[in-house]
């Protein structure tokens, strides 16, 4: 693992964002052959098809937001079921959402809600594995640790499909996971499944970035002086050999073939350093996204996609208020969770649109 702190689809003329949403949504429900990896593989092998979507940003709401408090308020249900929030109209006639996501309400013509996604598990751990891999965990209704025989996450599958091309041009990774809870230990002292490559092997893990982009000292890569020293060596493996006592814990890198070359390219690539440098963004734009882990994560996701990364997952930060709201549900939603999500998600859509990238970028919001 590299870790740094019923209508027929159009063919010849390309695939629209809504068609991608429809087909990609089926893959997220676990239907074989219709997921994002298959679509990307088709993009690479079927030259007669020229899909418009070139990248995907996954917004993963850690803790599982309740649909009756967000997108589908169940206005006809009993009060005990529907909660205290009121629906508001969107800019699409007949579509309503919760009152605390007003920005997204005015962008409803830009996204498609899939309200039929469900799963039979009653624990967060295996449910996350299901949502992020498309496959039910072999131990349903439990809280298992991440294991080597888990099914891989979507980013890992994409890395595997592009075997030999795990890094995009200029040393950029193919798949990145931001604010990664995969690096964080749960209350039960284990690491959650669903975020890793599983049985594909650690070399296909996404690039995990656990440091938050809203921190003033955000620096997911080593200082440039350190990278230059690495660049001056003939290979990263030689650097490991010369500092074997200090880097003994990384000896397993040799088992991954060209994996150490990926690490070397990541550390020394100017393009990677530029892509992660959110300080290059204008202060007003950063403020539009919101100075939160999620908001700045969305901004960084846009920068990465703009630079050539194919799949970026922005995980909701679990050390802050997150979506598993068994206590003080309504206050947390209206004071923190929904406003921060509404701000970051809506700005991401508008920013991509302003840059002419929205039709080529699939955004998937789920939890």
Language model feature labels by segment:
Residues 1-367:
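Ligand-binding pockets and gating/stacking loops
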């Amino acid at each position: 693992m590299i870790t740094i702190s019923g209508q027929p689809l159009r063919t010849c003329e390309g695939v629209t964002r809504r068609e991608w949403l429809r087909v990609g949504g089926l893959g997220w429900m676990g239907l074989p052959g219709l997921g994002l990896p298959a679509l990307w593989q088709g993009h690479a092998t079927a030259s007669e098809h020229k899909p418009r979507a070139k990248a995907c940003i996954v917004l993963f709401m850690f803790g599982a937001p309740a649909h009756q408090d967000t997108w589908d308020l169940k206005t006809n249900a009993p009060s005990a079921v529907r909660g205290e929030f009121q629906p508001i109209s969107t800019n699409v006639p007949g579509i309503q959402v919760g009152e605390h996501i007003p920005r997204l309400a005015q962008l409803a013509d830009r996204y498609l809600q899939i309200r039929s996604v469900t799963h039979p598990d009653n624990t967060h751990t295996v449910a996350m594995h299901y949502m992020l891999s498309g496959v039910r965990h072999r131990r349903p209704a439990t809280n298992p640790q991440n294991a080597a025989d888990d099914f891989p996450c979507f980013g890992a599958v994409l890395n595997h499909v592009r075997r030999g091309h795990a890094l995009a041009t200029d040393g950029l990774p193919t798949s990145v996971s931001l604010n990664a809870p995969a690096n964080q230990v749960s209350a039960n002292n284990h690491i959650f499944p669903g975020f890793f490559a599983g049985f594909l092997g650690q070399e296909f893990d996404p690039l995990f970035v656990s440091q938050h982009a809203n921190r003033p000292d955000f620096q997911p890569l080593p200082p440039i002086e350190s990278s230059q020293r690495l660049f001056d060596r003939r290979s990263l493996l030689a650097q490991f050999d010369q500092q074997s006592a200090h880097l003994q814990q990384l000896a397993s890198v040799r088992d991954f073939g060209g994996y150490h070359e990926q690490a070397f390219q990541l550390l020394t690539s100017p393009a990677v350093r530029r892509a992660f440098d959110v300080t290059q963004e204008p202060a007003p734009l950063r403020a539009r996204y919101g100075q939160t882990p999620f908001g700045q994560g969305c901004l960084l996701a846009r920068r990465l996609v703009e630079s050539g990364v194919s799949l970026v997952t922005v995980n909701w930060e679990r050390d802050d208020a997150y979506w598993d709201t068994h206590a003080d549900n309504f206050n947390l939603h209206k004071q923190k969770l929904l406003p921060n999500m509404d701000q970051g998600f809506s700005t991401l859509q508008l920013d991509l649109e302003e840059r002419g990238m929205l039709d080529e970028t699939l955004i998937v919001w789920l939890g």
